[in-house]
Amino acid sequence: MRKVTKHLNGIINAMVRCQLYVASVAMMMSLTACSDDDEPASGPTPTQNEAKMVLDKDKLAMIYSLRDLEGNKGRIYEMDYTVDYKLDKALNFGIHDTQSLKMFVALNLMDTIISTKSMNISYDAGCSAFACPDKTSGDYLMGRNFDFNHKDQNSNRIPIPVIAVHTAPAGGKKSVSFVDGQFVDYKSGFYTDGESDLSMLMALPYLLLDGINENGFAVSVLKLDGNPTQQQETGKKKIFTTVAMRMLLDKAGTVQEALTLLDKYNMCTDNVPASYHFFMADAKGDYAIVEYTNPNLDENPNKMEILTGNDTLRCVTNFYVAPSMGETAHGMKYSSHGMERYKILRQGLQEKNYLLTSDEGMNLLKKVAQGPESELTTGFTQWSEMYNLTKRRVTMSILREWDKTFSFEVK
């Protein structure tokens, strides 16, 4: 037993240096991604970088299939995740914090453990999302800005790589999801920099920040202020934020199915001081905000609340919208975190009677996008997306480059 404990401790100590965020053979997904002045990758992007913790040939083939969607700029990549990422085992593992997620990845997705170089990173987040029908086609849409301000120890902004991850698990639903590579210490250009260990690409299915599946169900996560969520209901297994999102994309076809799944688990996060809420929508036009609440801000949020509504709850940013949190410092009445963005989103939806085209939706995201000159402490817009839930398609711009888009489709 002592040897087993020593082995696990060695695994944890090795993996703790790799930054992780919050939480089967695949078919090739259809992807178009280019602009007039870029040369999209027609195949895997060549690299000399090693994956030192991976020995299995199928895993290595998958890692070396990564594609740079701008040729060789190192800003946005695509991967087909073609090996088993063992979701059912992850759900039974009881992943409840960053450390237990690291342990799961080490024990189940890696082949060997070595020490890796770490970075000192600070970050601030502030995201935006909304849902509405398309006024011309009748398709259902979801808009999303992912805002995250990665900084190094000298407070310089760290440029990130976006990674689009296609999955098609045996017995589960096909999906495409999006990952901020900096959460595993990857900077822009990491794949061909000659030094980054590519092993942490094995963790990608559990690092998603938003995504859509074959049924047109989409989910995103947004930051809240305050203590991290810690549910402790008897008889329920614990689940970490991004593991929950992976579960929803793999198993839920609608918002209602997603809500039923979430209710079976104790949600847990460990980022201090921060919690999260989910914004989700589906191809039937349903949408919801899921929050974990506790009006006593000295305690951890522990009550799951489901919130829907045509006006105030059709969009969301970074404060609690649950009435139970309304009189707290982090609720709608007093919080300033994302309030201006929320007002812009709500007004934009109201003015269009909650009916927008995809282009109008992207313009609305543009209005609430954040750069170095605005809301410095709450985020930096890394990517903006319009999800067409009906067509299972995502149109993305990165870094507020609105004239250049990347399109992803789940078939």
Model segments located where?
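Secretory/export targeting leaders with adjacent low-complexity proregions
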Residues: 260-270, 278
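Sec-dependent signal peptide hydrophobic core
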Residues: 12-26
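N-terminal mature-domain region immediately after signal-peptide cleavage
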Residues: 35-253, 267-268, 354-411
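Non-transmembrane alpha-helical segments in soluble domains
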Residues: 246-249, 259-262, 346
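Long, charge-rich alpha-helical interaction segments
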Residues: 330-360
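N-terminal secretory signal peptides that target proteins for export/translocation
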Residues: 1-16
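Extended amphipathic alpha-helical segments with heptad-repeat/coiled-coil character used for oligomerization
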Residues: 272-326
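C-terminal motif of bacterial Sec signal peptides marking the signal peptidase cleavage site
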Residues: 29-33
